[in-house]
Amino acid sequence: MKKIILKCKRYKEIDDCKESVCLHGWLMEIISDQFAEELHQTGTNPLSLQTIHDDETVSFILNLLNEKACSEFEPLIMDDALERIKLRTGEQKEFQILEKRVYEMSEKKLSQIFYANDCNNVLKLKIVTPTAFKTNGKYLFFPDIRMMFQNIMRKYNCIFENTEDVDLELL
């Protein structure tokens, strides 16, 4: 699993959620048609995005959850020739890339963090990115809690068990 952070120059006031959606569209345009189709067909998206900004910069954070996503996205994003991100929509349509960083975490290390630490019985879940799910062939932009937990379980299974199966009875 890898996290790629693209730190870019901010020229305009932006909405982090809207820019994440626009970035997702840009990413779907730069990857192969075959992989884009795989992402649309699969139940678990091995990519998650987050956008955060301060007064002068915008950071696009890409979390790549499996080897396939890493092999498809990382060479395109980390290519030295990629100096700007040009979006079709959004408040700021062009972002000059100031810095690129990659962080890698092995499944073993994530397991250690996940299982070795004492955990509270109560967790606070803060959703900081747009949340939409495809169900019955349509996108649902305001999902219910069951769909959100199903997605979390699928991502867990994708990372640790190499399967997308979820125990629906558990939900």
Question: For each of these PLM feature ranges, what is it?
Answer:
Residues M1-L171:
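RNA-interacting cores
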